[in-house]
Amino acid sequence: MEGALEVLTDPADSVGRELRKRCRLHLVPNCNPDGSKRGNLRVNAAGSNLNREWENPTAEKSPEVLAIRNHMDKTGVDFAMDVHGDEAIPVSFLAGFEGIPSWTDEQGERYYRYE
């Protein structure tokens, strides 16, 4: 995320400049701040694995996901990228969106260009 933010905020970066000009960007640097503060990799303070809460988030179990989903529903989403990290892997990786009912082959082709 740090690298993406550097590119997006650097006035001298041509890629960042074009993205700022052509796109409305919504970035969530950390979907699980309370869990991260407690040293949790996947679960929030309520003990919910946020990776498994996207289909039916609730205010009680996954308020973080609910807030993000509500914003996505409100503003619409043309493209999303879910970047993950793992202490056992020295690099970040993309998590896929397979299984989403509205996911199309065309979206998949565009998405997997970034792997």
Protein language model features and the residues they cover:
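Active-site/substrate-binding loop(s) of hydrolase catalytic cores
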Residues: 1-115
